[in-house]
Regions:
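Amphipathic alpha-helical protein-protein interaction segments
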Residues: 65-73, 85, 513, 529-788, ...
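Conserved alpha-helical positions within TPR/SEL1-like repeat arrays
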Residues: 104-115, 141-155, 181-195, 222-237, ...
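Eukaryotic all-alpha helical interaction scaffolds
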Residues: 114, 126, 133, 153, ...
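A domain-level signal for caspase-like cysteine endopeptidase catalytic cores
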Residues: 414, 773-776, 806-873
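Caspase-like cysteine protease fold
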Residues: 551, 880, 887-906, 952-1003
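Catalytic cores of nucleophile-dependent amide-cleaving enzymes
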Residues: 799-809, 864-961
């Protein structure tokens, strides 16, 4: 996890892939592509750079190579010429097989000494080898000796000496038949050039080595592969990743030719990691497919080789934000593990796999399983003192615990990570600072402001020498948030100013918007009205920047104040300064951000024709956010502009897909015209930690905002109590007083006078409720007003997850009332609805007919799709819920998860999910939000879902009346209201009639 610090999983898992392979099948794998330089092979003698740099370019340096390498002024006399001829004759006579073998033995002895760490004795042996080879005029031996001596000086960082040695080696080997030796010499020269900061000539030498190997059609492809791997490693070491790619590819090709499938898989897995590091995520996935192809065709150990291949694939999928597919890939991997000889699977392999799978599970919200896998990995890393991975994994577990509100456990894990950092060498400063920031964020949220301040001050101290304005700005901003909460306004403002100064240097909008929100709050507290308005206007400008968007990772908490709460302060500040329209748009942007992040986290699927664009655009956005951590935002301005141009084009051609990738700008005029066209009143809520904003938009073009003095946690508690009470009292004859009290309290809180004055006077005009967080799980129809009546008795209601749902709604798809019902159960429900509306209007799918493809075909042209399956949505990931539908796999049928529906085409006016139920612990309302938006993307205009499972008799009766009303020409909102009124007249108990929630425009 070392390539990209803010995407630790995506980077390190590729490295772990190579390590995993080495530990499973016994190849000489390494922890990173660079570690090959330390491998114990003959090639390890070629670890340096060189080329054709002039003496002026590299400077002069006295060289002492022994008596056999003296630079002398040539003697032009005839006696000298005759003497040379005579010596040549003598040397030719001395060059025998025995003398050549002696030269080679000296080289082998030198290599053994060098690999054993005895470098000086090795150098002496190579010098002796060179002298003997020169005596017998054995140029190949001379060249090999010089190459190895060049390696010695490269390792000693004496690059000028290494350069001259490498150049002489190439001159000696230029006309040699030993082309492999010449290729190695060129690599040695390339290493020297790299050391002299001459990468252009270094790459030329590596290219020349590659050409030699390709033209010579080496009889030893394994040796050629090793040379190519070394070339690739050098390119990585000296930051030439694009050049490294082709050398890795050549190395893998040679290893395949040599039937070394394990090495071929390892090299291509390493290449996957490099491509991920470079941000070429799609190319990484394509390369991972090649890894799997090699693994499957391996004549032996195929299953074992598929483990790193699957891991490489999961890495690429994770990098592409395709978290659901990454999860499925890991599921395949762990299903395959038992088929491998367990003796081949070391504890380190298990730790690597647990670590990778844990990060994927955390990304999709399966926190319990994620903690199990990460804890297993952490325990191993800690035992073997793999301190970096131990610290990073402990930090990730701490973030998981914090996300679940387990602050005590979270702080304990962060403290362990901090303690481990004390013994990490070299120091991982950024990871340490991130952990301290995470610790401070949790302490802030648990009320330990003093401890949070101390940990942030430690983070500021350890990063003081780093030339990283973004990091400094982030720490100053975090410290300001803690100081503000501690009422230390003076120091809070001082740190805000520091944060602004540092962030402005690198145009870091993600910090600037937060800093100006805080600055405005301080100024408003001092009654500096004009300055406060100026600051909040600046904050809004930065907030709208795509670079400031939220892109959370599984190992960071961001800031002490969550993005949701800081955005609430932004909206509240705008509204209090008379900028209500801008406040409403800021609230919309925040909600769209939250939806996009939750969609990606849960693994929402898209239509096949949209998948490539979706993955490319979303991964490009993720890559830009990741790159900001490695560089600075100002260096990525052109890339962001390019991304925005593509996003605008996509928004114009495929708006529904664009909304799954990033928030789209919305204008107030669009909002007003849509509300007026629908003759509706929109009531939108934005929940903060301490208070809530209620916006109203009516058909007369009026926009208002009202501050409600209750925050998110209060509503979460009330809704949870309500849902628990409803489920607990199932079967009772009357609603409990507790339920009525909660419903009446919620009405008075959510509909204060400032909101009620804009509500319609008659039920002929629609109210569109746009909730936030826990309010998604609230049955608004059942709220009890000051007269003791349910809200639905006086108003026509629908719910939308966002104003954009209204903006994007299309006209009715089909005026002809017809229903497709799909279920293997619920016969009574299907029969009663069919009898009520007429069997000729109902198509019932059962058994094998409920395949997804057939369902999609049968639903085409129908006005409604009815799904009576009982589905209880889990707390963290509703899309993992299993449905009664199937898809064909390998000639058989397999049940599918809820997310697969979104990739289909369901062009229906209405989809009814009649027996769903939400989890009372789902405090964000994600189940209804994600399911309704996903089905809307698939083509549905309205979605009717149930918050809890009503008693069957009352539920079916309400559904029958709903469809009768729909058949009579009413729209979905009118149909549901009339059915609920009929149910209330029979039994006013909330649990028996208020479970259904309509999401969509309502018409």
């Amino acid at each position: 996890m070392r390539f990209m610090q803010n995407r630790p999983f995506a980077a390190n898992k590729a490295v772990s892939t190579a390590l995993t392979l080495g530990l499973i099948v016994g190849v000489n794998a390494c922890l990173s592509p660079l570690a090959v330089l330390a491998r114990t092979s003959d090639l390890s003698a070629l670890s340096g750079p060189a080329g054709f740099a002039s003496e002026a370019a590299v400077g002069k340096e006295a060289l002492h190579f022994g008596e056999g390498f003296k630079q002398m002024t040539p003697d032009q006399s005839k006696q000298a010429e005759a003497l040379i001829k005579e010596l040549d004759t003598i040397n030719q006579n001395q060059r025998t097989n025995q003398s050549i073998d002696q030269v080679r033995r000296l080289g082998q002895e030198a290599s053994k000494l060098y690999n054993a760490g005895q470098r000086e004795p090795a150098l002496s042996k190579w010098q002796e080898m060179y002298g003997l080879a020169q005596d017998i005029k054995y140029s190949e031996g001379e060249g090999e000796a010089l190459s190895n001596m060049a390696r010695f000086y490269v390792d000693a960082k004496q690059y000028v000496k290494a350069k001259y040695l490498g150049e002489n080696a190439i001159e000696l080997l230029a006309n040699s038949s030993e082309q492999q030796t010449l290729a190695k010499a060129r690599i040695a020269l390339a290493q020297a050039y790299f050391g002299l900061d001459n990468p252009v000539w270094a790459i030329q030498q590596l290219d020349a080595a590659l050409k030699i190997l390709n033209l010579s059609q080496s009889k030893d492809p394994a040796e050629a592969a090793s040379v190519m791997y070394l070339c690739a490693s050098l390119c990585v070491q000296f930051n030439k990743p694009k050049d490294a790619i082709r050398f890795y590819q050549e190395a893998a090709t040679y290893q395949t030719q040599a039937n070394n499938y394990g090495e071929a898989v390892r090299i291509r897995a390493t290449l996957v990691g490099l491509l991920i590091e470079m941000g070429w995520f799609t190319a990484a996935l394509e390369e991972a497919e090649k890894v799997m192809s090699i693994a499957k065709t391996a004549p032996t150990d195929s299953n074992a080789l598929q483990i790193p291949a699957l891991q490489a694939t999961a890495n690429a999928q994770y990098a592409l934000n395709d978290y659901a597919e990454a999860r499925r890939t890991y599921d395949k991997l762990f299903a395959l593990l038992p088929q491998i000889d367990q003796k081949m699977i070391s504890e380190q392999v298990k730790a690597n796999l647990n670590n990778g799978f844990g990060f994927v599970l955390a990304a999709i919200g399966d926190y319990d399983q994620a903690k199990q896998h990460l804890t297993a990995a952490f325990n191993y890393f800690k035992t073997v003192r793999d301190n970096f991975n131990a610290a990073q994994t402990a930090n990730a577990i701490g973030v998981l615990e914090a996300n679940e509100g387990n602050y005590g456990k979270s702080i304990s894990m962060f403290q362990q990570a901090i303690d481990i950092h004390a013994v990490i060498s070299p120091r991982a400063v950024k990871l340490n600072a991130d952990t301290l920031l995470n610790m401070a964020a949790v302490e802030y949220r648990s009320g330990s402001f003093r401890e949070a301040k101390l940990h942030l001050e430690s983070a500021v101290a350890i990063t003081a020498k780093l030339k990283n304005s973004s990091m400094r700005a982030r720490l100053y901003q975090a410290l300001a948030e803690i100081l503000y909460k501690s009422s230390d306004i003076t120091n809070a403002e001082a740190n805000i100013n520091k944060a602004i100064a540092e962030a402005d240097k690198v145009k870091d909008d993600s910090i600037l918007w937060r800093a100006y929100v805080m600055k405005s709050r301080i100024q408003k507290g001092r009654q500096e009205v004009d300055l406060a308005k100026e600051s909040i206007t600046s904050a809004l400008s930065y907030f709208r920047s795509p670079q400031s968007g939220d892109f959370p990772t599984v190992d960071t908490l961001g800031f002490p104040v969550s993005r949701e709460d800081m955005a609430y302060y932004l909206a509240e500040g705008l509204a209090s300064n008379g900028m209500t329209e801008q406040a409403l748009l800021a609230a919309q942007q925040l909600k769209e951000e939250n939806f996009v992040m939750e969609w990606m986290r849960q693994g929402g699927q898209v239509k096949p024709e949209d998948k490539d664009v979706f993955l490319e655009m979303s991964s490009m956005r993720a890559r830009l956010h990741s790159a900001e951590a490695a560089s600075t935002p100002d260096q990525l301005t052109k890339e962001w502009q390019s991304w925005l141009e593509r996003f605008r084009a996509l928004s114009a051609s495929n708006k529904s897909l664009a909304r799954l990738i990033s928030p789209m700008p919305v204008s107030i005029q669009e909002v007003l015209s849509t509300v007026q066209k629908n003759n509706a009143v929109a009531v939108e809520y934005l929940c903060g930690s301490e208070a809530t904003l209620a916006f109203t938009v009516d058909s007369q073009g009026r926009i208002s905002s009202t501050r409600i003095a209750f925050g998110r946690d209060r509503f979460k508690s009330q809704v949870r109590t309500l849902l628990a009470s409803v489920n607990k009292t199932a079967g009772d004859t009357a609603p409990g007083e507790n339920i009525r009290t909660v419903l009446a309290s919620l009405y008075s809180e959510l509909f204060p006078a400032g909101v009620r004055q804009f509500l319609p006077k008659t039920p002929d005009q629609m109210i569109v409720i746009i909730p936030d967080g826990p309010l998604f799980n609230l049955p608004f129809a059942a709220l009890i007003d000051e007269k003791g009546q349910y809200l639905v008795q006086n108003h026509l209601l629908t719910m939308a997850s966002s104003l954009t749902v209204l903006l994007d709604s299309s006209p009715a798809h089909n005026d002809d009332f017809s229903i497709v019902m799909a279920s293997n159960q619920a016969k009574a429900e299907l029969d009663q609805i069919s009898n009520a509306v007429g069997p000729e209007r109902v198509t019932v799918l059962q058994g094998k007919q409920i395949g997804l493809s057939n369902l999609e075909e049968q639903a085409r042209g129908k006005s409604a799709l009815h799904i009576p399956a009982k589905v209880a949505f889990p707390e963290n990931n509703s899309l993992r819920s299993m449905l009664p539908f199937t898809v064909e796999v390998d000639g058989g049928a397999r049940a599918i998860s809820a997310d697969r529906l979104f990739g289909s085409k369901m062009g229906n006016d209405l989809i009814v999910w009649s027996a769903s139920s939400v989890n009372s612990k789902d405090g964000k309302g994600n189940a209804l939000k994600i399911m309704s938006r996903g089905l809307g993307y698939a083509g549905a205009r309205n979605v009717l879902m149930s918050l809890w499972s009503q008693p069957d008799a009352q539920r079916i009766d309400e559904l029958v009346n709903f469809y009768k009303n729909k058949q009579a020409g009413m729209n979905p909102a009118q149909s549901l209201r009339k059915a609920q009124l009929a149910a209330i007249s029979k039994d006013p108990d909330v649990k028996n009639w208020a479970g259904f929630q309509l999401l969509g425009p309502g018409y």
